[in-house]
Amino acid sequence: MSNTSPELDQLAKALAAAQAEMKNATLNKVNPHFKSKYADLAAIRDTVTPALTKHGIAVVQGTDTTEGSIIVFTRLIHASGQWIESRFPIPYDKPQTMGSGITYGRRYTLSAVCN
């Protein structure tokens, strides 16, 4: 799910310029169950933050709650005030599930909104 400000022209131009400078994040972790490599949240932030900042785009991540789930969101906010947001619901039943789900959601929403 995605939400945006009414206007996106300045953000779109800045985001396109930032994306042109971004490289793929380093696959610095291994999933022990599937033996696959992935980029953790820190690697993704290290990859996208310099280019976004250079082009006047801030990253804000947080959570909202609904019954039985947490909504993780990542919002890119341009210096003009224009913004785009990606939201990801995380069902949970235990605090450990919630904590890992929030990290998972932050990683995936940041990747999605910057791609």
Language-model features: locations:
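Polyanion-binding surfaces on beta-sheet-dominated domains and ring/shell assemblies
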Residues: 1-115
